[in-house]
Swiss-Prot record:
All copies of domain Ketosynthase family 3 (KS3), residue ranges: 411-845
Domain annotation PKS/mFAS DH: ranges: 1338-1648
Protein name, as recorded: Atrochrysone carboxylic acid synthase Agnpks1
EC number: 2.3.1.-
Gene: Agnpks1
Naturally occurring in which organism (per UniProt): Paecilomyces divaricatus (Penicillium divaricatum)
Active site: C584 (for beta-ketoacyl synthase activity), H720 (for beta-ketoacyl synthase activity), H763 (for beta-ketoacyl synthase activity), H1370 (proton acceptor), D1559 (proton donor)
Length: 1807
């Protein structure tokens, strides 16, 4: 008897049946894993794959891995996130949890197929002759997934084909598992919280018949009316057993309730991935979905079935003629047909008889029961000898010793996808760098002052010890600029961190930003798979700058290993980080190392580069003495005949690299492609520093060979080209020999261009390689070669004289280098090390990338974000500028680039627009409102609530763009529609697919199913975008979708309930007999208006939103009544009056259906019930009775929301999303729960779906909801390109420790002792250059007069008697403080002196001292025997301009000067003009004085006499000596006053304008602010940093009588800053004015910090002062006498000798529990304060100073959120010192940003 149909003649079985065969072979693939340890099997297969004898096995594992990677990339984000990083498919064997979860079917499928096919390949590679399968009469059989594996063998003609065919099997297995899981979860959702072994979907029952089982199933499922899709069915049968399958819960229920199944033995099978062999669930479309891929089409073109595979349902071979048909047969078999192994046995036995076989070899992996049965049947055939061969043991076998070996490195092309730089010459980005190169600039300059004093450290004669022989270099502008807060660094840490590290961090961010990097967006950007690699060859900043102030961050901020480590730490990369030093080749060697990591699979993305910032004069001196450096003023004179060494340079560059296939899959911009890289050593050179042409040429050829590139195809070589005679000559020889040899001549059409970037920007040493790499990448991008500018005089004469013949060309001007279609431009970068190493990298241009499709979306989201308002403004401005420069920019690409391909920070702007013009308009509007912009909280994303719309918002037919263009949404709809059709309902697709007009009416079953299924699909679509609900609420019909999304109902049961209910309504209720009317009124208002009319309340939607139901006649009667009272009414377009008596006829039947066939489960997220007006958490509340009541009873949406709010399920921060075809519920939510953070619709009637989605996504994004933007763009990514947008706009400030003095010259030697006068008596002051000498200007030490320009420098000793008396006559905090009037006298003296020097004939000189700014208070030493020198310079470039600039400095003991502590501008003027300009103000001032007189007479203003005024002033702040006490009386009202002044007649001192005269007429302003009862003088004091102008039109004379007037007002920008104008009157005329005098208010507790003598060892740490001009974080340098620099928090470490406890990372504070599923967390633990510990007292101080309750200071409270700013930080720090003895600085709260962090630190060190 035959058990198969006659196959077509082209089937492979025909070939087997023609003729008699003596031997048959059957290869059997099981559906069970071998009993061997799976990890061991894969590990041994992996080890075999490394052996060169098993290239096919290796290729199979590689191809299988690539196939899985490709399928993983296509997964939705929520599934992709489940898969850990993997290097090879065999890694999945280690993912135990994954094999239990949602992807278990896919993972086990690929593992089983991999181990079986890998084992088979390993077996046949060892026995290649045995794979002559066709002539050997081979047939194939398998079970389950094993049947799928047979396809690989059937299609393969040779073993070498198996990697390709096997990879397709792996792909199909993975796709099959995904589909099976997705479909099965609609039948019974998996419990995501259960991590134990899942329940089985299949049980085997031995010793029963299939008919018995089917009869019992029919009976039981008929009783409970189980939906068709959820029914249990027979999935496999044999003579001795039957296997049944179905949803696990239903199987378990069946075994509990059925006596038949209870009485029979059953065994659960390890089937956890879902249902197969289910013809009632799956369709041919499902088969096509799995099989028909682009890779399958490729397989069809190369392979066709060679061997027969026996069907497990018929026993006959599959009649397939190509790969697609074969896989469709097999997938269809697995999905839709029951297994009947007996038929396979019969079919094989029949075949053996038909061909007359005498021997049959059965090849198995391990023996099993099906093979036992098959072998037993074959043995009954007469004359047939049967044997079984297990091949798993071959996996465990070891190769004989001495055989095999490594297979070789895996070579991929490496794509460079991002770049950034900081280069000399102002090249702060790659575009400016190209402009520099293209312009042919040489950007050398003298060593700038921020590095070291070039004059003292440079000696061209080479005689001075440790001095440089050259004063030149190429330098980055302002290398200290850095956005410390962005990178989570305190000012102190930033200041002490090497600028190389900082700029590496910045350029890494910019390069990643340009690469479109977003963490974990793709497999290649998984944080575990990213590493950093940076070259650095020196630690200048640590050795020189920060070594002057060694503190906490000296090691991590200065040691080079921390550079790449810091990048990894900031970005949270957990791949490797390397800092590599190979001298001048460091960065290119590092890039090669990064390539190796990519080639080896150690990382999937690499960030690499190099850094060099020069601050150490030692290196200049050492390289000078080593004869490396040129002494001439130029960058490197590369290839010049007079080349004499190189010019040192700064540079920082970063690039981002990926394997090319990953970059293309990630849709990256590919700037260039590295084909090969290698390093060798010039071992045979004459010295370690000397190059060797032979080794260099060998390396060049080696790299070309590895890349598979003809050396003649190289079009450009970027040479090392340092400009040394030896280096240039050796390199040109090596380059010409490698790429332009004499043996193979280049043609004129194929020249070799050479260049060297060092001729533009110098030799940046460790960064030279990446600098050269960036140049080449820019050449690819710009299609041009920039001019070479190194040849200043003539070409090096020792160069080969046949360069022209070899077609080697030097581009002396910009040369076009265009892209040629069909041919890649190829370039080489050379980088050599002074230590002997040579590194060469060969690159080609990136592939041309063009969009292959069109994005159909009409509206797009554009997002801009930053970490600060300043940067947000800058980022918006940059985008606007980009759009101006690129008017043709694609909006779709802009959206994709700013959303899916950028990091999103807490200051956000997102807009939805349909055109670039709209984008510009909206961004401009956002720009104008940046200052009022509020950032999203940093505490985490807000909870999300889904609200599901009822039928009242639906419309008859809708054309969903999502259905047509979103594969994910479409797949969800199709799966749900298939379930509906499987349950006997008509397809609802016509309602949503656009096939009908919007007003086309469908049946109620179709309409209601369409609504609910659309809402389910929308909710899941939101989930695919990463937006998942923490709580749900459904309105009326929408509640069914809500219950499904919450996990209460399966999709199958949801469809069953909705469809059956609609069918009952159609059957038992009359359409149109009843109506529903929405009324804009409350229940009370309706009752008051229409209480006597009959109606039913259907919905209570909001405070004034109510829906009535009832018969149409009753509704017709009530509407005019309600509208007559002003209540707007409108009828809902619904067929039936839900929630009214009209539904009564269906209630019993509906409840019965729900009771019999539906499983209600506990919700996985809270459900807000409008029926029960409560939040449901349990598995009892929702049942058949519930759905009955929900049909009939009112929807109390209002009360449900209020209850949810009251118990904390939702709050003001909740983000609401309406799930439905048109928004209705969001209006109810806003009116009920106002204020609402954000409430948005999913779809809107009349609007394109993507317009609504874009608007909603933009709003959610700005509210802080995390959106998976990549998933939003994924269906359209083929149409999208990443734009090269401007990089982040940094909020930079300067962080820099200046090298002070010349200790780098003098260290450890006596060479300079004589020069400095050391080891002898203290040096006298420098010899005076002039005889001028006053009490404040002691001697002129420098004088330079050149025509109209001039400079005068003076030095004075503050300890000289008159000067010291002037300082101590102005005491603050018992310290002598140099008042601004002293600075004014100095200014008048020097200004007059300089003016008369330049204009000797001038007699009287009048000056306006403008813009005086005192950055640091000048405080006198207590010891008068000491010296305390200051230096002041005055300079003018043109006295004709009538201006000069003044600068004040402190002078150190070694004669060096500090940073300037004060500055001013002198403006020479005409006093008559001043007097005239003040005339209009005189009567106003006099009027105010008269008003103050009147207020004083009436007792409103205060009048103080001379003694009382100065007593109050002394008690408040300043204790003046008698000479300064000129005010005879003061009248004061609030912040306004006038004083009568008589100047002292006491003589003494030599002054230009005596300071006590100036102070007497001007210090009224300080008196007002420090004495007035309008100020809190008990807790605060005010001091001045300067004024805008000081003009005295008449001289101040001893004994002169004056009147001063001032009114101080707080500034709008900063209420702690006060401004005013002091008017000086004489005889009723304004004769002088101090304009724009400024005071700042400080807490009094800081007085000691601000004003302590420099030589006081017991002084507290010096605090910071104020400036309106200098950047916040500009650090002070050491040795400052007085107040340190502007707003920079004082250093915590050892200021003024006070030892402090070292800081630790503040990361161990207690954090608040985040909200889960929308439920608010319990209140954070309050800080313990009821103890006498230092910690408790510290917390109490913080509470007192910040004005907060102790309850507010929870461990998770951040100081920034509590309002602890830099000033309050100083106050609290001073309180800690004074009250607790805890010495800290104001930066403490930057380093320990939360209460918990600070508490942990205090407890560690002070408890």
């Amino acid at each position: 008897m035959r058990y198969c149909t006659i196959p077509p003649v082209h089937s492979p079985i025909i070939r087997l049946q023609h003729g008699i065969l003596s031997k048959m072979k059957l290869i059997y693939f099981s559906n069970e894993f071998p009993p061997d340890d799976l990890h061991t099997l894969f590990r041994e297969l992996h080890n075999h794959s490394k052996d060169r004898r098993h290239p096919i096995l290796a290729r199979f594992l590689e191809e299988a891995t690539l196939a899985v990677r490709e399928e993983v990339r296509r997964l939705p984000a929520h599934l992709r996130a489940l898969i850990p990083p993997f290097e090879s498919i065999w890694n999945f064997a280690d993912f135990a949890d994954l094999r239990k979860g949602q992807l278990c079917g896919s993972i086990d499928g690929i593992l089983l197929c991999s181990v079986e096919l890998g084992t088979l390949i390993r077996y046949y590679e060892n026995n290649p002759d045995a794979f002559n399968l066709e002539t050997g009469g081979t047939i194939l059989a398998g079970l389950g997934i094993g049947l799928l594996a047979t396809a690989a063998v059937s299609l393969a003609s040779t073993v070498a084909d198996l990697p390709i065919t096997g990879a397709q099997v792996i792909r199909q297995a993975f796709r099959l598992g995904i589909l099976v899981d997705e479909v099965s979860q609609n039948l019974q959702p998996r419990d995501a919280t259960d991590t134990s072994t899942p329940d089985s979907w299949a049980y085997v029952l031995p010793n029963v018949s299939a008919s018995e089982v089917q009869q019992e199933l029919d009976t039981m499922q008929g009783i409970v009316k189980t939906p068709e899709a959820s029914k249990i069915f027979i999935s496999a049968l044999s003579a001795t057993a039957v296997t049944i399958s179905g949803p696990p819960a239903r199987l378990q229920a069946m075994f509990r309730t059925s006596q038949f199944f209870h009485d029979h033995k059953s065994v659960a099978l390890p089937v956890y991935g879902g249902l197969c062999h289910a013809k009632h669930i799956y369709t041919v479309e499902d088969v096509h979905h799995i099989v028909r891929t682009s890779s399958m089409a490729l397989l069809d073109s190369k392979f066709s079935p060679q061997l027969p595979i026996h069907s497990t349902s018929t026993g006959a071979p599959f009649p397939a003629v190509n790969a697609t048909e074969l896989f469709e047969h097999i997938i269809g078999e697995i999905l839709m047909r029951a297994i009947q192994w007996d038929k396979v046995i019969q079919g094989v036995a029949q075949l053996a008889q038909d061909v007359g076989a005498t021997r049959c070899e059965i090849v198995v992996f391990r023996n099993s029961l099906p093979i036992h049965d098959l072998a037993a049947a074959l043995k009954t055939i007469p004359g047939l000898e049967t044997s079984t061969q297990e091949i798993i043991p071959w996996v465990h076998s070891k190769p004989p010793a001495g055989e095999g070996g490594p297979r070789g490195p895996l070579q991929s092309k490496i794509a460079i996808v991002g770049m950034s730089c900081r280069m000399p010459g102002g090249a702060t980005d790659t575009e400016k760098f190209w402009e520099l190169l293209e312009s042919g600039l040489d950007v050398h300059r003298k060593i700038p002052a921020d590095r070291f004093d070039v004059d003292s450290h440079y000696d061209p004669a080479g005689k001075r010890l440790n001095a440089s022989h050259t004063p030149y270099g190429c330098f980055i502008d302002e290398p200290g600029l850095f956005d410390a807060p962005f990178f989570n660094m305190s000012p102190r840490e930033a200041q002490q961190t090497d600028p190389m590290q900082r700029l590496a961090l910045v350029t890494a961010y910019e390069a990643l930003e340009r690469a479109g990097y977003v963490a974990n967006r793709t497999a290649a950007t998984d944080l575990h798979r990213i590493g950093t690699f940076y070259g650095q060859a020196s630690d200048d900043y640590r050795e020189v700058n920060s070594a002057q102030e060694i503190s906490t961050y000296f090691i991590p901020g200065g040691c080079r290993a921390f550079g790449p480590g810091r990048i990894n730490y900031f970005f949270k990369f957990s791949g490797p980080s390397y800092s590599i030093d190979t001298a001048c080749s460091s960065s290119l060697a590092t890039i090669q190392t990064a390539c190796a990591a990519l080639w080896n699979g150690d990382v999937d993305t690499a960030v690499a580069g190099g850094t060099n910032v020069l601050t150490n004069s030692d290196a200049f001196a050492g390289l000078s003495h080593g004869h490396f450096l040129s002494k001439t003023p130029n960058a490197c004179k590369t290839w010049d005949c007079n080349a004499d060494g190189y010019c040192r340079a700064d540079a920082v560059g970063s690039i981002v690299m990926k394997r090319l296939e990953d970059a293309e899959a990630d849709n990256d911009n590919i700037l260039g492609v590295i084909l090969a890289a290698a390093t060798n050593h010039s071992a045979e050179a004459i010295s370690i520093t000397h190059p060797h042409a032979g080794h260099q040429a060998y390396l060049g050829k080696l790299v070309a060979n590895r890349a598979g590139i003809d050396p003649l195809d190289v079009g450009f070589v970027e040479m090392h080209g340092t400009g040394t005679q030896a280096g240039d000559a050796e390199e040109i020889q090596s380059v010409t020999n490698a790429y332009a040899p004499t043996t193979r001549r280049r043609t004129a059409k194929n020249p070799l261009y050479i260049g060297a970037v060092k001729s533009n920007v110098g030799h940046s040493e460790a960064a030279a390689g990446v600098t050269a790499m960036l140049k080449v990448l820019l050449m690819f991008q710009k299609n041009a070669i920039p001019p070479h500018v190194g040849i200043k005089t003539g070409l090096n004469p020792i160069f080969p004289n046949d360069l022209d013949k070899r077609q080697v060309r030097i581009p002396y001007e910009r040369t076009e280098w265009p892209h040629v279609p069909g041919k890649k431009r190829v370039a080489v970068v050379n980088n050599f090390s002074a230590a002997g190493g040579n590194t060469t990298i060969l690159l080609e241009e990136g592939p041309v990338q063009e969009a292959t499709e069109t994005d159909p979306r009409s509206t797009h989201v554009v997002a801009v974000s930053a970490k600060s308002k300043i940067s947000l403004k800058g980022n918006i401005e940059r985008i606007l500028a980009y759009l101006e420069q690129h008017p043709d920019a694609s909006l779709a690409n802009l959206s994709y680039s700013t959303t899916a391909r950028r990091y999103h920070h807490n200051h956000r702007v997102a807009i939805a627009a349909s055109g670039i013009a709209q984008v510009k308009k909206q961004l401009q509007s956002a720009l104008d409102s940046v200052d009022s912009h509020k950032p999203i909280p940093t505490t985490g994303a807000p909870p999300v609530a889904f609200t599901f719309t009822g039928q009242g918002a639906s419309y008859k037919s809708y054309n969903l763009e999502l259905f047509s263009s979103s594969p994910y949404f479409r797949s969800q709809i199709l799966h749900l529609d298939a379930i509906a059709q499987g349950q006997g309902f008509a397809s609802f697709l016509p309602v949503i697919d656009g096939s009908h007009q919007r007003d086309h009416q469908h049946s109620q079953v179709m309409t209601q199913l369409a609504l609910v299924c659309t809402e389910i699909a929308i909710a899941k679509y939101w989930g695919s975008l990463g937006v998942k609900p923490d709580v749900v609420i459904g309105h009326s019909l929408g509640e069914y979708a809500a219950l499904h999304i919450a996990g209460v109902l399966s999709a199958s049961d949801t469809i069953f309930l909705v469809g059956q209910r609609a069918a009952l309504l159609e059957k038992k209720c009359k359409v149109g007999s009843h109506n529903m009317v929405a009324v804009r009124a409350s229940l009370a208002q309706i009752e008051a208006s229409a209480g006597k009319y009959p109606y039913e309340i259907a919905c209570i939607n909001g405070p004034k939103e109510t829906v009535l139901s009832g018969p149409t006649t009753e509704m017709d009667a009530i509407i005019p009544v309600l509208e007559g009272d002003g209540h707007k009414c409108y009828r809902l377009e619904v067929a039936f009056a839900f929630h009214s008596a009209q539904t009564d006829p269906i209630l019993d039947g509906f409840e019965a259906l729900a009771n019999s066939g539906v499983l209600f489960q506990a919700p996985q997220i809270p459900v807000i019930s409008p029926l029960l007006c409560k939040v449901i958490f349990d598995d009892k509340s929702v049942n058949a009775r519930y759905v009955r009541r929900a049909t009939r009873e009112p929807v109390n949406f209002l009360s449900a929301l209020e209850i949810a709010r009251d118990i904390g399920i939702v709050d003001d921060e909740t983000a609401w999303i309406e799930i439905g075809p048109h928004p209705v519920c969001v209006g109810f939510i806003k009116s009920t729960l106002s204020p609402v953070n954000v409430a948005v619709p999913s779809l809107r009637r009349g609007d394109d779906n993507y317009t609504t989605m874009a608007q909603s996504l933009a709003a959610l994004h700005c509210a802080g909801v995390k959106v998976e933007w990549s998933e939003f763009h994924r269906p359209f990514e083929a149409a999208l390109r990443l734009l090269d947008l401007p990089t982040y706009a940094w909020n930079d400030k300067t962080y820099w420790i200046q090298y002070i003095g010349d200790w780098a010259l003098t260290k450890g030697n006596t060479f300079y002792d004589k020069e400095k006068g050391l080891n002898s008596a203290p040096a006298a002051l420098p010899t005076p250059k002039s005889s001028i000498s006053t009490s404040t200007v002691h001697q002129i030490i420098q004088e330079s007069i050149d025509g109209e320009a001039g400079t005068v420098v003076m030095q004075s000793d503050l300890m000289q008697a008159d000067f010291r008396a002037a300082a101590w006559g102005h005491k603050m905090n018992q310290c002598g403080v140099v008042t601004s009037s002293v600075h004014a006298d100095i200014a008048y003296t020097l200004g007059e002196y300089l003016y008369k020097k330049l204009k000797p004939k001038s007699k009287q000189v009048h000056m306006n001292i403008a813009n005086l700014e005192v950055l640091k208070g000048l405080i006198a030493n207590k010891n008068p025997e000491s010296h305390q020198l200051i230096q002041v310079s005055v300079t003018t470039s043109d006295i004709g301009s009538n201006t000069a600039e003044l600068t004040w400095y402190n002078v150190h003991a070694d004669g060096t000067v500090d940073e300037p502590f004060a500055s001013a501008t002198l403006i020479y003027g005409d006093p008559s003009e001043w007097l005239s300009s003040w005339i209009p103000m005189t009567h106003l001032v006099q009027g105010r004085i008269h008003e103050l007189e009147r207020l004083a007479e009436s007792g409103v203003a205060n009048r103080f006499n001379h003694q009382m005024a100065y007593l109050l002033f002394a008690n408040s702040l300043v204790d003046y000596a008698a000479k300064y006490r000129g005010m005879q009386s003061v009248v004061l009202h609030e912040l306004e006053a006038f004083a009568d002044v008589v100047l002292s007649t006491e003589s003494g001192g030599r002054w230009t304008v005596p300071p006590y005269f100036i102070d007497s007429v001007a210090h009224l302003a300080g008196f007002v602010l420090n004495v007035s009862d309008a100020m809190d003088t008990q807790n605060n004091f005010c001091i001045t940093p300067g004024w805008r102008s000081m003009r005295l039109a008449r001289p101040l004379v001893a004994g002169g009588r004056y009147r001063s007037y001032v009114k101080m007002i707080p500034t709008a920008e900063d209420p702690s800053v006060y401004l005013g104008d002091v008017y000086v009157l004489q005889d009723g005329v304004v004769v002088g004015m101090v304009g724009g005098i400024q005071f700042r208010r400080y807490p009094r507790i800081l007085l000691s910090r601000f004003f302590s003598a420099p030589d006081d060892a017991h002084a507290p740490p010096v605090a910071t002062s104020t400036s309106s001009k200098h950047a916040v974080a500009t650090p002070a340098t050491k040795g400052v006498n007085g107040v340190k620099a502007v707003k920079a928090a004082p250093a915590v470490n050892g200021t003024n000798g006070v030892k402090t406890v070292p800081a630790v990372n503040g990361t161990n504070g207690v954090k608040a529990t985040p909200a889960v599923n929308g439920v608010k967390p319990a209140p954070p633990v309050e800080v313990e304060v009821n103890s006498d510990t230092t910690t408790a007292k510290a917390i109490q101080i913080i509470a007192a100073e910040s004005g907060l309750d102790l309850a507010d200071l929870t461990d998770d409270s951040s100081f920034a959120d509590l309002g602890v700013d830099s000033l309050m930080s100083l106050v609290i720090a001073e309180k800690f010192r004074a009250d607790l003895g805890v010495v800290v600085g104001g930066s403490l709260f930057l380093e320990y940003p939360t209460i918990g962090d600070l508490r942990s630190w205090l407890e560690e060190y002070y408890s």
